[in-house]
């Protein structure tokens, strides 16, 4: 069950909207790439983020993995991001041995 739905570690997400949630499996790095229709943009909202700073972080990247990013985030309220193209990537990373904190990241594309 760990590899299904919003709790999966990474992957390409093509649905119009959805949610990315805490991955609690053994991997320490997860990268999700959200792809909207060509000409559309991707919007991401993180209502509440409270990770263990220094041990884990979320990174929002404007485009495909490795694109310019908005910095490493470990806490915040009401965070929103918008891509400049039809792709946006989200990376979650934690140090080995540290249990993942819970988080929910919501995304949608403009149509």
From Swiss-Prot:
GO terms for cellular component: extracellular region. Residues 9-110 form the CUB domain. One of its GO terms (biological process) is single fertilization. Transmembrane segments: none annotated. Disulfide bonds join 9-30, 53-74. One of its GO terms (molecular function) is heparin binding. Keywords: Acetylation, Disulfide bond, Fertilization, Heparin-binding, Secreted. The modification N-acetylalanine is found at residue 1. Its main location: secreted. InterPro entries: CUB_dom, Sperma_CUB_dom_sf, Spermadhesin. It holds the Pfam family CUB. It is found in: Secreted. Coiled coil: none annotated. Belongs to the spermadhesin family. AQN proteins mediate the binding of boar spermatozoa to component(s) of the egg's zona pellucida by a carbohydrate-binding mechanism. AQN proteins are secretory components of the male accessory glands being coated to the sperm surface at the time of ejaculation. They possess as well heparin-, serine-protease-inhibitor-binding capability. This is Carbohydrate-binding protein AQN-1. It comes from Sus scrofa (Pig). The lineage of its organism: Eukaryota, Metazoa, Chordata, Craniata, Vertebrata.
